Amino acid sequence: MESEKDCVFCKIAAGEIPSQKVYEDDRVLAFKDLHPVAKVHVLVIPKKHYRDVWEVAAADPDLLAHIVEVAQGIARKEYNGSYRLVFNTGLDAGQTVFHAHAHVLTGERMAE
């Protein structure tokens, strides 16, 4: 697991690593995923480092609500408001970057 100083998302939020920004304010940054798995695949991250969504929820519930609101706004702009919002939490759930982030996915129905 990376430390905060080694966190790639912290570096993106600080502008040390470039990204394709979709939205930014003083609390969050949204950018296109480098390896999209949907027509629209955007990541919404808090600028402050939290390991996962549970840390955000415990420390700052208003920030978690803001992340969801930003995701909804992106989905409305990019794909008429139909979207999936995914938080992978923990290694076994597929979390590969241990900085809380939401995946905003649009464009395809999930297989039944």
What is each of the regions a protein language model found here?
Residues 1-112:
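HIT superfamily nucleotide-processing domains
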